C-alpha cells in the first residue's frame, strides 16, 4: 500500500523578527481524520508557526501543501479559502450578537429580493452546523448568555461554515470545566470522523495522550521530531521538548544564605493562585518555573499588592505584613519588575532619569516641596554608571534604548528604594545575549549584598543556571520544589505539566 498523503505539510518554514529568528527550517505534517499534537516549551515557536499557517504572519521561507497541492497563504482570508481555521485561546466571539450572527459573521446570507440579511436562513443553517457537532444551542440566544464551553462550540461551528479542512485549537481547555472539556473531546471526535485534520496545542499531557494520534515537537524555533502517540510516553515526550544542556553562559555565584526574608502561607487570589506557600532567604535567588497560565505572574502580583489576596499570609523578616495595594508592598520593601516592561515597567515618553526616580520623588523634596534636581541628578548618574546603562545622557527618552538597557533602568528605579525582596518577571525576555549576562551579574551582586530575589522565567536554562532553588507552578498551584543540584529540565517539565511523582 502506498504512503498516505497528509492533509497538511509544511516544509522548511523560517520566520525572523528584528534580532530574533523565531523559526528555522521547520517542518510539520497533519493527517485528515487525526488529531496532531503540536508541543514545545514556551517560546519554542508553536504560536509563530500556527500564525503563519492561519495567515496572521507571512513566512520568510518554506512551502505549505494541502492534500499534496502547494498553497500560498497570503493572509487570514486566503488561509480560510484554503480550508485553514484557527480557534484561539482568547475566543473572538461578540457577546452583543446572537449565536447565528456570530457563526455567519462576515459571511451573512442575504435575501435575494430585499438585500437584507436573511435571519431565518441564518438560524436554520446555524442550527444545522451546531447539530453536526452535537450541540443543542438556540441560534437566537445572545452569546453573552453562554458559558465558555458553549462559546467555543460557536467558534467550531463557524469554522465548519467556511469548509474548514484543518482546524487549529490553541490551548482549548484552559478555561473549561471538566464537563465542558469532555464535551469538547466528543466534538473533536466528530470532526475527526468527518476527515478534518485537527492540530491541537496544549501543555496538558493527559489530554495529549487521551485524544491525539501523533505529536510534532518544536524546540528553540526548530523541528525537534515527531512520533506516533502509541510509541511514546511522558518521559520521551518531555525529552523531545527540552533536549538541550545548560551552557556556561550563566554566571552562577554561590553565596551564604542569610535569615528568612519572606514567608508566604496559603496565598490565593481570584486571578488564579491557589494556596501557595513558600519561603525565601536573604542572599538567595528563588527561580519560579511553569508553563504559560500556571499562575507565576499572578503569584508575584498578589505579593506585590496588584492583585488582592482572597486568603493567606505574607511575612517579612518574621513579622506578618498587610499588603492591600502596591504602595503597601513598596513601603514594606517588596518590589516587582513586570514581564511587560514597556506596558507596566516604564513610561516610554519619559526620559531615563525621570523613569528612574519616578517611585522615589519624595526623597528629593526640599523644604519648599519642590524637587532638589541636583541631588536627583547625582543619584541618576550613580546608577547609570553602577549598572552600566548605555545611554547618551539621563535626558534620553527610554523608548530609544535597547531592551537590555530599558530593563536596567527599571531595575535601577527599584534599587533606589533599597528593597529587601525583589521579584523580577522574565528578566531577559527580548534582550540580546550580552545584555543577558550583564543582568545575571547584577542579580548575583544583589544576592551577594543580601537581597532576597524571586526570578520568574520561561527560559529553563536561565532558571537552572541562575537559581539557588527552583519552585514549579502548575494550574495555579505549587507543584513542587527542587534544589539546584537535583534540578534539570526534565524534572522541571514533569512538575510543570502536573506529573509530580
UniProtKB/Swiss-Prot annotation:
- Work out whether the entry's keyword set contains Nucleotide-binding: yes
Where the record annotates domain ABC transporter, the positions are 8-245, 255-500
- What residues does ATP bind to? 40-47
Provide the protein's localization. Cell membrane
What is the documented function of this protein?
Answer: Part of the ABC transporter complex RbsABC involved in ribose import. Responsible for energy coupling to the transport system.
User: What is the membrane topology listed in the Swiss-Prot or TrEMBL record?
Assistant: Peripheral membrane protein
**Assigned protein family:** Belongs to the ABC transporter superfamily. Ribose importer (TC 3.A.1.2.1) family.
Gene name of this polypeptide: rbsA
- Main localization, broad class: membrane
Which reactions does this protein catalyse? D-ribose(out) + ATP + H2O = D-ribose(in) + ADP + phosphate + H(+)
Q: Provide the GO MF annotations for this entry.
A: ABC-type D-ribose transporter activity; ATP binding; ATP hydrolysis activity
EC number(s) on file: 7.5.2.7
What are the UniProt keywords, alphabetically? ATP-binding, Cell membrane, Membrane, Nucleotide-binding, Repeat, Sugar transport, Translocase, Transport
Self-association state and partner proteins as the record states: The complex is composed of an ATP-binding protein (RbsA), two transmembrane proteins (RbsC) and a solute-binding protein (RbsB).
Q: Please state what the protein is called.
A: Ribose import ATP-binding protein RbsA
Task: Please provide, in alphabetical order, the Gene Ontology terms of the cellular component aspect for this entry.
Answer: plasma membrane
Origin, by domain of life? Bacteria
Query: PROSITE patterns given for it?
Result: ABC_TRANSPORTER_1, ABC_TRANSPORTER_2, RBSA
Amino acid at each position: 500500500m502506498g504512503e498516505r498523503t497528509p492533509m497538511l505539510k509544511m516544509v522548511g518554514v523560517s520566520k525572523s523578527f528584528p534580532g530574533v529568528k523565531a523559526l528555522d527550517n521547520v517542518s510539520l505534517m497533519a493527517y485528515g481524520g487525526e488529531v496532531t499534537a503540536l508541543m514545545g516549551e514556551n517560546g519554542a515557536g508553536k504560536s509563530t508557526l500556527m500564525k503563519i499557517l492561519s495567515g496572521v504572519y507571512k513566512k520568510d521561507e518554506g512551502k505549505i501543501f494541502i492534500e499534496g497541492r502547494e498553497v500560498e497563504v497570503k493572509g487570514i482570508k486566503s488561509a480560510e479559502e484554503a480550508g485553514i481555521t484557527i480557534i484561539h485561546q482568547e475566543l473572538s466571539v461578540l457577546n452583543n450578537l446572537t449565536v447565528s450572527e456570530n457563526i455567519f459573521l462576515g459571511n451573512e446570507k442575504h435575501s435575494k429580493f430585499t438585500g437584507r440579511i436573511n435571519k431565518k436562513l441564518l438560524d436554520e443553517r446555524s442550527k444545522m452546523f451546531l447539530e453536526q457537532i452535537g450541540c443543542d444551542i438556540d441560534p437566537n440566544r445572545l452569546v453573552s448568555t453562554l458559558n465558555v464551553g458553549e462559546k467555543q462550540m460557536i467558534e467550531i461551528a463557524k469554522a465548519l461554515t467556511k469548509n474548514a479542512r484543518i482546524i487549529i485549537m490553541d490551548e482549548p481547555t484552559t478555561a473549561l470545566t471538566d464537563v465542558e472539556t469532555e464535551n469538547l473531546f466528543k466534538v473533536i471526535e466528530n470532526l475527526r470522523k468527518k476527515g478534518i485534520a485537527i492540530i491541537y496545542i496544549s501543555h496538558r499531557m493527559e489530554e495529549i495522550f487521551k485524544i491525539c494520534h501523533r505529536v510534532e515537537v518544536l524546540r528553540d524555533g526548530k523541528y525537534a521530531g515527531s512520533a506516533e502517540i502509541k510509541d511514546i510516553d511522558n518521559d520521551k515526550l518531555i525529552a523531545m521538548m527540552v533536549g538541550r544542556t545548560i551552557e556556561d553562559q550563566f554566571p552562577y555565584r554561590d553565596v551564604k544564605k542569610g535569615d528568612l526574608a519572606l514567608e508566604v502561607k496559603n496565598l490565593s487570589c481570584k486571578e488564579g493562585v491557589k494556596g501557595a506557600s513558600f519561603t525565601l532567604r536573604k542572599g538567595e535567588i528563588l527561580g519560579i518555573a511553569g508553563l504559560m497560565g500556571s499562575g507565576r505572574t499572578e503569584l508575584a502580583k498578589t505579593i506585590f499588592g496588584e492583585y488582592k489576596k482572597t486568603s493567606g499570609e505574607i511575612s517579612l523578616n518574621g513579622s506578618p505584613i498587610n499588603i492591600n495595594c502596591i504602595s503597601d508592598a513598596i513601603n514594606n520593601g517588596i518590589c516587582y519588575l513586570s514581564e511587560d516592561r514597556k506596558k507596566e515597567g516604564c513610561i516610554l515618553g519619559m526620559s531615563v532619569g525621570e523613569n528612574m526616580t519616578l517611585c522615589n520623588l519624595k526623597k528629593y523634596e526640599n523644604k519648599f516641596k519642590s524637587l532638589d534636581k541636583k541631588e536627583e541628578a547625582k543619584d541618576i548618574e550613580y546608577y547609570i554608571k553602577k549598572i552600566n546603562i548605555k545611554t547618551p545622557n539621563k535626558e534620553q527618552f527610554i523608548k530609544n534604548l535597547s531592551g537590555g538597557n530599558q530593563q536596567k533602568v527599571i531595575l535601577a528605579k527599584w534599587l533606589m528604594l533599597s528593597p529587601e525582596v525583589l521579584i523580577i518577571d522574565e528578566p531577559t525576555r527580548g534582550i540580546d545575549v550580552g545584555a543577558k549576562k550583564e543582568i545575571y551579574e547584577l542579580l548575583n551582586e544583589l544576592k551577594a549584598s543580601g537581597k532576597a530575589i524571586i526570578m520568574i522565567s520561561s527560559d529553563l536554562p536561565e532558571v537552572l543556571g541562575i537559581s539557588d532553588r527552583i519552585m514549579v507552578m502548575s494550574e495555579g498551584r505549587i507543584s513542587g520544589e527542587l534544589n539546584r543540584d537535583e534540578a534539570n529540565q526534565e524534572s522541571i517539565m514533569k512538575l510543570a505539566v502536573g506529573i509530580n511523582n
